[in-house]
Amino acid sequence: VRRRAAEAVLDGTWDGGNGEPAGKPQADLVSMARPLLADPEFVNRAARGLNAEINHCIACNQACLDHTFGNQRATCLVNPRAAYETELELLPAQGTKKIGVIGGGVAGLFAAESLALRGHDVTIFEAADTLGGQFNLAMRVPGKEEFVQALYAVVNRLEGLKVNISTGKAVTPEELQADGFEEVVVATGVRPRIPEFPGVAEGLEGTIDGVTVATYAELISGKKAPGDYVAVIGAGGIGYDVAEFLLEDRQGEPQSLTSWNSQWGVVEDSDVHGNLSSPKPERPQRRV
């Protein structure tokens, strides 16, 4: 590309080279900022060919840029030790313990990793069939497909640390005690907050005058199907994500290049100045 282009060519990526073998660089210069907050070992892992273990930046800006703009210490949503390394030290444990982590969401996975790095014998118990918790919902939202890479990376690291993983069954206190667990970490996650509006509780069990009532988790997971005209109660981050999901409804599949180009007015015809034309956004499937 460089030999044919008069301008500099830039790219944004969050992994260690899209699987390219170490020692075969495809770029003249690599510049990183946020990815090094997410994983200070980024370069070392990439050099050793451990791209699948790189802790991925999900470009959320919530703990790095947002904190910086608020005159707070910058850290990282997927690496809470970022900028706290001298305070949250992962020192070798003086005695190995058998520890159970209840919940295989993001908090449980990272807690298990920290404990295993200190030398403990760790088992994760997840009642659902898959690990990831809320990340499994977030990665279905258009624009957040990259979240899946962060989830895969921590699971790969846990496998390397020989962390035991049990899914598809809730564990009881009696079972934990019988199996000799010395410590238990509770990381069971969150549930959608149900507003105390008249009829909402009843609607979640069925419908209200033919209108479906659903939580964000039920909609995004596909447990309930949305209609053609949807009201979203709540305008925070989750409400916005739900609206995006409902308008595109791609079920977390990456958008095709052809569709993206059309939506943003990018054309491949080199005779067009700047390779731009009038954008042609796709018509939303429903009103929100």
Predicted segments with their positions:
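Glycine-rich dinucleotide-binding loop and its adjacent helix/turn
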Residues: N79-P92, N156-R157, I165-T167, V190-L276
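Residues that mark the start of a beta-strand
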Residues: K98, G227-Y229, R287
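A conserved short coil-to-beta-strand element within the FAD-binding core of flavoproteins
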Residues: S166-D179
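Short hydrophobic core segments
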Residues: F125, G180-G189, A231-I233
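Beta1-alpha1 glycine-rich phosphate/pyrophosphate-binding loop at the start
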Residues: V101-T167, A235-V288
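Flavin-dependent oxidoreductase catalytic cores
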Residues: V1-I102, V106-V122, T130, R193, ...
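Short, hinge-like loop/turn segments at secondary-structure boundaries
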Residues: A47-L50, R140-K144, G203
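Conserved acidic residues
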Residues: D28, E182, D228
